[in-house]
């Protein structure tokens, strides 16, 4: 045998990356032979899982397409049909005794080859798509294991790497055949009937040995690449959905982040359509073929393709309802619904709009085709949405949190963190970001609120105290605020911008904990006497507390500490009204002025509205996050919001655009806060009231 042949016979193909490796580079401790590179990349603790996933993917994509079904048992005559190169490789391997194989393993190797009853016509790289899967899955059918394939959700690179580390306990003898001499399918373990998660060992048993007898339907596609939206098992779909959901959440985050400024810059027809549709969200949708599959549309946006000026409507759908799984297209959610309904993972849907129905009014049973509401002419903004077709927004009490809340809440936290720690990007987690300033929308749109983004409302509704005063919620959300107006009488406090506050306060979580402790110990004379309105610790306000503003002991007697807004849009907003008479009552991030130089400190005077100078109820008022002296009662805040127009950015009620700490970007109310403030004229008991 020539040196080249010997070298070739000594090489073993890695089950995951499908690359020929020398014996010393292979590991047989797993159900399949894998190279050290794959194991190192994936980690020995999860290699089995990756192998199972690869096995499932290969099987589900019928990588045996065009090959003969393989023997039904270990003794089937398939082995007689093996390619001569395979037989030669086996002989060479047996003599070389590669990979510390003993006699038993060598015997099993022959058995393993028998189970690969593949046609001899196909060579290793004859599969157009199987030549090199991004995931390292060579498109080889694998024993039927339903282990959740994490690979499905990973990028091609990660998948390929995962292949490197997916070497389940494989019988060494079987994989010792040089990969370049074996048909591609021979390099992979045969499909088996083992239950999901059961380790598959090549040639271990009759079930495995007959592995390649998988029906062509299960492994005949020959497409080594698994479609991004297709999974062979529920677990795979879940895994894939997680990755897709993460990507969709990123799209949603980007969409909401620059929504106002971007919408204002779009053509009027596009802007009007978006505002109209947004005002109708959220609304329920269902799959036309299975009415039990429900989702909900909660946001809209317009996207233009590169190089084109035309805009196309983009909608964000949550499916199933309340799951926080986001789809950024109708076709994507329709495809998922189709898979859930028909269990057909290979078919794609051309257009989701003709497979989805929406309910015009919740509970009416009036379901209409989504394609009728959003025909192509509307989706490309050639025509306006028919007013008679618009659904009425409905927020299911059973799942009040919209996915957009995942973006808005973190936004406040990020802003606070960014301001408190100069350099912080505010991206404390996916979706957490700092709100960008955006031009004010046309006043004509002022009457329309983006109710679709009711995430803010939902967040408020989750607040323990039922943040009635949306103003406080605004502050709590850390929405950017406008420049501070002149101090009102009774507000001798300094107007030093929060920027001046040192950024060396505690971390967001530490600040939150400190505030919690402070609030628990605060002794505001008004506590428990807020006129029946419980303290407004909304979850948003709590989030605000995460801001890095240092929290001081709530103990300044007779004084209400203004939340020192160390961070732009920090949580200090007066969702928690600064207790006028004592320690920060519910003050989110109220900082003891003594602890923070330059942080505004309220004088012992009563809290008064900056606009009307009326005395403020100590726990319910709107606090500008940037200027401590800017405090507003709800009526004045409502008037300001209405005057500015709730559809666009609504800045500080003072009429100024108070910049966030450490930046020139003004803060603005979030839509949920606006909705809360405008929800109703709640009579709030004033301190002076009997």
From Swiss-Prot:
Example of a GO cellular component annotation carried by this entry: nucleus
Zn finger (RING-type) start-end: 609-656
Biased amino acid composition, Basic and acidic residues: 234-245, 254-263
Annotated localization: Nucleus
Region (Disordered): 59-87, 136-263, 418-564
Organism: Xenopus laevis (African clawed frog)
Coiled coil: 231-259
Pfam family, one: zf-C3HC4_IRF-2BP1_2
Bias type Low complexity, positions: 463-480, 538-556
Main location: nucleus
PANTHER family noted in UniProt: E3 UBIQUITIN-PROTEIN LIGASE IRF2BPL-RELATED, MYELIN TRANSCRIPTION FACTOR 1-RELATED
GO molecular function list: transcription corepressor activity; zinc ion binding
Sorted UniProt keywords: Coiled coil, Metal-binding, Nucleus, Zinc, Zinc-finger
Family: Belongs to the IRF2BP family.
Compositionally biased residues, Polar residues: 207-222
InterPro entries: I2BP1/2_C3HC4-RING_sf, Interferon_reg_fac2-bd1_2_Znf
Protein name: Interferon regulatory factor 2-binding protein-like B
Gene Ontology biological process terms from the UniProt entry: regulation of transcription by RNA polymerase II
């Amino acid at each position: 045998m020539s040196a080249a042949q010997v070298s070739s016979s000594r090489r073993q193909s890695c089950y995951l990356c499908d690359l020929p490796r020398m014996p010393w580079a292979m590991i047989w401790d797993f159900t399949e032979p894998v190279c050290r590179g794959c194991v190192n990349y994936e980690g020995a603790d999860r290699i089995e899982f990756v192998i199972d996933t690869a096995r499932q993917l290969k099987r589900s994509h019928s990588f045996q397409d065009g090959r003969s079904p393989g023997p039904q048992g270990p003794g089937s005559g398939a082995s007689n049909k093996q390619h001569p190169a395979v037989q030669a490789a086996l002989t060479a391997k047996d003599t070389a005794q590669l990979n510390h194989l003993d006699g038993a393993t060598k015997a099993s190797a022959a058995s393993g080859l028998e189970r690969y009853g593949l046609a001899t016509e196909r060579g290793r790289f004859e599969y157009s798509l199987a030549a090199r899967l991004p995931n390292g899955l060579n498109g080889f059918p694998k024993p039927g294991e339903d282990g959740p394939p994490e690979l499905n959700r990973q990028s091609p690179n990660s998948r390929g790497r995962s292949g490197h580390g997916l070497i389940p306990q494989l019988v060494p003898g079987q994989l010792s055949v040089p990969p370049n001499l074996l048909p591609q399918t021979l390099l992979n373990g045969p499909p088996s009937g083992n239950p999901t998660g059961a380790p598959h060992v090549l040639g271990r048993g009759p079930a495995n040995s007959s592995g390649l007898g998988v029906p062509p339907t299960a492994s005949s596609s020959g497409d080594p690449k698994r479609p991004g939206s297709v999974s062979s098992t529920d677990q795979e779909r879940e895994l894939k959905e997680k990755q897709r959901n993460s990507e969709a959440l990123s799209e949603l985050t980007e969409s909401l982040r620059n929504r106002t400024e971007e919408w204002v810059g779009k053509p009027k027809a596009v802007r009007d359509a978006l505002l109209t549709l947004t005002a109708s969200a959220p609304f329920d949708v269902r799959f036309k073929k299975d009415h039990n599959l429900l989702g909900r549309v909660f946001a809209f946006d317009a996207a233009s393709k590169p190089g084109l000026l035309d805009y196309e409507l983009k909608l964000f759908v949550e499916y199933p309802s309340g799951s926080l799984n986001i789809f950024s297209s109708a076709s994507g959610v329709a495809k998922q619904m189709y898979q859930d309904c028909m269990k057909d993972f290979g078919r794609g849907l051309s257009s989701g709009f003709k497979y989805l129905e929406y309910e015009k009014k919740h509970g009416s049973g009036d379901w209409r085709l989504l394609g009728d509401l959003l025909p192509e002419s509307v989706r490309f903004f050639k025509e306006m949405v028919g007013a008679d077709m618009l659904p009425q927004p409905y927020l299911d009490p059973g799942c009040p949190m919209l996915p957009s809340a995942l973006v808005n809440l973190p936004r406040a936290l990020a802003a606070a963190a960014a301001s408190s720690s100069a350099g912080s990007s505010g991206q404390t987690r996916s979706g957490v970001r700092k709100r960008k300033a955006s031009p004010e929308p046309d006043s004509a749109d002022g009457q329309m609120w983006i109710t679709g983004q009711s995430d803010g409302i939902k967040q408020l509704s989750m607040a323990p105290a039922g943040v009635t005063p949306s103003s406080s919620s605004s502050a709590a959300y850390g929405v950017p605020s406008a420049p501070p107006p002149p101090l009102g009488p009774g507000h001798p406090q300094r107007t030093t911008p929060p920027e001046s506050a040192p950024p060396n306060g505690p971390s967001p979580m530490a600040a939150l904990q400190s505030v919690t402790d402070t609030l628990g110990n605060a002794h505001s004379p008004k506590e428990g006497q807020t006129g029946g309105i419980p303290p407004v610790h909304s979850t948003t306000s709590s989030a605000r507390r995460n801001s890095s503003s240092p929290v001081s002991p709530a103990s300044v007697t007779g004084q209400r500490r203004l939340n020192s807004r160390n961070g732009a849009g920090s949580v200090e907003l007066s969702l928690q009204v600064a207790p006028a008479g004592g320690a920060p009552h519910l003050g989110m991030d109220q900082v003891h002025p003594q602890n923070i130089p330059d942080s505004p400190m309220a004088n012992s005077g009563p809290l008064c509205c900056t606009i009307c100078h009326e005395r403020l109820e100590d726990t319910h008022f709107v606090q500008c996050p940037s200027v401590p002296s800017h405090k507003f009662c709800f009526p004045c805040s409502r008037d300001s919001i209405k005057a500015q127009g709730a559809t666009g950015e609504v800045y500080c009620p003072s009429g100024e655009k108070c910049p966030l700490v450490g930046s020139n970007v003004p803060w603005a109310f979030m839509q949920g806060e606006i909705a809360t403030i405008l929800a109703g004229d709640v009579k709030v008991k004033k301190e002076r009231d009997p």
